Design a protein with these regions (language model features):
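Substrate-binding N-lobe of the ribokinase-like
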Residues: 21-86
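Glycine-rich phosphate/dinucleotide-binding loop and adjoining beta-alpha-beta core of small-molecule
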Residues: 1-7, 60-176
Length: 176
């Protein structure tokens, strides 16, 4: 029988942090998330990374998203990206994104893949492909990042992979 999940149970399974540690001791997450129409996804992504113990969290996104997230979560670092014609993250931002120091890349929430025009969907596929293959750490592919990766694979391309592990986090609708 599984144990009852209580606050005490959860706290007993969270390791104590060494007194001499600092935020750099607990990893750095780079979240590539959000678009002009989907700002909340980026905010929830960053908040989740911070709450689960990431030492440093950087959000790579377009200005309206960065403004909304920084007002709510001032501890988040920001990587401003060039906007595309529809308020998305332009692939022109890939070199800037890859220059960020991170141990984990999270890509996908709020990119708006399913709501995009054909041109914008192609740009999102480019983001996913180049960011994953150019990343030296582990990566989490979620939401619209999964949809873009599925589209790449449906076109006969291999699933792009980072240097370390790739974690896929589909919900039931994304698994079909």
């Amino acid at each position: 029988m599984a144990p009852e999940i209580t606050a005490e149970f959860v706290w007993s399974h969270i390791p104590k942090r060494p007194r001499e540690s600092n935020k750099g001791s607990f990893g750095a997450v780079l979240a590539v998330a959000g678009s002009a129409c989907y700002r909340g996804a980026a905010s929830l992504t960053v908040e989740g990374a911070l709450r689960t113990g990431a030492g440093i969290v950087t959000l790579a996104s377009v200005e309206p998203v960065l403004a909304a997230v920084s007002a709510r979560l001032p501890e988040c670092c920001l990587c401003p990206c060039e906007p595309g014609a529809e308020g998305e993250i332009s692939p022109q931002s890939i070199p800037r994104i890859l220059r960020q120091k991170a141990t984990v890349l999270l890509i996908g929430p709020g990119l708006g893949y399913l709501a995009q025009s054909t041109a914008r969907a192609a740009e999102t596929r480019t983001l996913v492909k180049k960011l994953l293959t150019g990343f030296s750490g582990s990566a989490v592919l979620d939401a619209d990042g999964l949809n873009a990766a599925a589209s790449l694979m449906n076109a006969g391309e291999e699933l792009p992979r980072p240097a370390k592990e790739l974690i896929l986090t589909p919900h039931p609708g994304e698994m079909s």
